[in-house]
Amino acid sequence: MTDYFVNEYFGDNTVTSVLKPEEVRERFGPLFCRKFLVMADEDSGRAEIIEECRHRGAIEWDVMNRNRAGGAVESIAVDGASMTISAKLGRYPVHFGAAGDEIGGQALEGVEINGDEIATHWAGIAGAGVGVAACLPQAPGVLRTEYPSEADMTPGGAKISRTTIYTPKYEKVSIGIDDTDTKESGATWVLASKCADACDIEGVEYLNMRLIQLNPKVPNKTTNCVGSALNFAVRPGKIEELLEFVRNFIESGAVSKDTGIAVHTGLIQPESPYLEKIKTEVLTIDECEAEAKRLGIRYIDTAASKGRIGALGAVLWANRGIEAAGLHGEH
């Protein structure tokens, strides 16, 4: 008899109970998940799941076990008490059971799009079952949770729990910004950060701001030659409203007449030789505009000036590692 379970309920759509977050909280008491948000990119067949917990140890154990279980998980990045899962859309077999060699005690069995919602399918055993049946389902951002059986609603001990958690569908929007300042005044990262803080559009969730070190050897630059990127999770139908807000905020607050703003939508990071060139070469506006067009990146600024060079660099590096903030070759 095997000691792990591979998609035990695969294809079984039976639902015994559906609970909203407040009902989960009432049943189990308040627990520890502080955020649960899912973005999807149907063109690439990918999803990104952001989860924040009050306790770092829970995040770290979940990450190791979800990776071991496989399923829809492709990779997971950890930042303190939060994780970001890169996942594939669909339902997949998992190596799930009591934690052991190549077996995870918690598993992401699938991610599916249902209209303007996203369903994530989970399995957990023992304490990890409490995570998928009681903790995640009451997180801010969750709409409701389906439990296939009454047994799934009594997690803990040595028992297995499975759930399907529904959240609003979001898309990822990355915005690169450069050349808002001059040698006399201004700071692009400050203006970009203020823009993010001021955005209160319903259906838009601010994720993070990144600083991108550009080539400090270019002759026509501000002192440190640094661009900024803003990342947002955005509900379908809200993207243009967000972009209009960002453009108006940035251009009204800029002290430079050369401000550039570039936009990329989706979860697949563009691969381009300009990832290196933006840190090592002196580039022209024309070649950066041509590369942006090739990659499906669009400019929304009105200046159409040299800021577009750094804005392209910022959006290309917006979702990469700490190397974004360094000179070429620094790690």
What role is predicted for each listed range?
Residues T2-H331:
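Conserved mixed alpha/beta catalytic, RNA-binding, or beta-rich assembly cores of soluble enzyme
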